[in-house]
Regions:
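Alpha-helical metal-binding/catalytic segments enriched in His/Glu/Asp
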Residues: 107, 120-173, 305
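A non-catalytic alpha/beta surface segment that caps or lines the substrate-entry region
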Residues: 52, 56-110
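N-terminal capping segment at the start of a domain
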Residues: 34-70, 125-126, 279-286
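Metal-dependent peptidase/peptidase-like ectodomains
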Residues: 41-42, 166-263
Length: 314
């Protein structure tokens, strides 16, 4: 064989192998699973519109939305109505406390592995003293808009998604405790529970639950990308609806923007706001109205909820 013919044959063989490799690579790429879609931005105007509705409900019902009061049941009907319209499977879970009937709103998004349920929750009730717009209309409205975003995207999660609005948290997590007790053997099907209690405090901090490192990392990574420093949540530790889940051995996480603890100088440097003042000076008071909010914190935390729901359910 001549040298030139040998070179031509080698070149031909090399080209064939290269073409075959390219074909295989292209086919493999076409068959690869697509990357999960990123969570959408949650419109803070929509969250605030929900809070305005909760304020109107309180105004029309004696100034509060407390357990056993007409304002609470009207809040339940408002939340459930929006979820039903969006295509969620909803149920009202009843319980009794202090001689009054309470309600949890439970909403399941069809699809996903129900043996691995990612659950997000917030308490819907206020104290008797006021409308409870930050505590905890903020968390309730935040997860409502995330749930509606799930429906709008027609999300097809790998894990099942459930949202909950608990009653009578203010008397000691009564609604969430009732829910967890009724789970029975189905406790093992809850992959994680995320709690959102006060996410729009007017002098806000950015606190992340550290009860489970996997869930904590999801939130911390989100805020790190936005150059927002976070701290470990300690003020509300064991004082909100995540506690019954944690006691049952379920992984819990969540966010909190502060209540009646005072912001330090270092925190004011990181987050802005006023050092020496409470994160929420209207905590459990009549002034916890729709004016008692920080829009930026409400926006950032609502987006963080969406990020966690999308990531943990994929």
């Amino acid at each position: 064989m001549s040298r030139s013919a040998r070179i031509r044959r080698i070149a031909l063989a090399t080209g064939t192998v290269t073409a075959l490799a390219a074909t295989l690579f292209t086919a493999a790429g076409a068959q690869a699973d697509p990357a999960p879609a990123a969570a959408p931005d949650i419109d803070v105007k929509a969250v605030k519109a929900d809070l305005d509705q909760l304020q109107s409900i309180a105004d029309a019902n004696g100034g509060n939305r407390a357990h056993g009061q007409a304002g609470y049941k009207a809040s339940v009907d408002f939340i459930k109505g929006k979820l039903d319209k969006a295509g969620f499977k909803t149920q009202l879970q009843e319980f009794d406390n202090n001689g009054a009937k309470g309600y949890n709103v439970i909403a399941d998004w069809p699809g996903g592995d129900e043996s691995k349920t990612v659950m997000s929750g917030a308490h819907l009730d206020s104290v008797d003293a006021g409308p409870g717009i930050n505590d905890n209309g903020s968390g309730s409205a935040g997860i409502l808009e995330v749930a509606l975003a799930v429906a709008k995207a027609d999300l097809k999660p790998t894990k099942h998604l459930r949202f909950a609005w608990f009653g009578d948290e203010e008397d000691g997590m009564v609604g969430s405790q009732s829910y967890v007790e009724k789970l029975g053997a189905d406790k093992s099907k809850i992959d994680s529970y995320l709690n959102f209690d006060m996410i729009g405090s007017p002098n806000p901090g950015y606190f992340v639950y550290d009860d489970d490192s996997r869930l904590e990392k999801v939130f911390k990574d989100f805020f790190a990308k936005k150059n927002i420093a976070t701290e470990k949540e300690t003020e509300g530790d064991g004082r909100s609806d995540h506690a019954p889940f944690k006691d049952a051995g379920i992984a819990v996480g969540g966010l909190f923007s502060g209540a009646d603890y005072k912001k330090t100088e270092a925190q004011a440097k990181n987050w802005g706001g006023e050092a020496g003042k409470a994160f929420d000076a209207c905590y459990h008071q009549s002034c916890d109205t729709s004016k008692n909010l920080d829009d930026k914190a409400l926006d950032n935390n609502s987006d963080a909820i969406a990020h966690a729901v999308w990531e943990l359910s994929s």
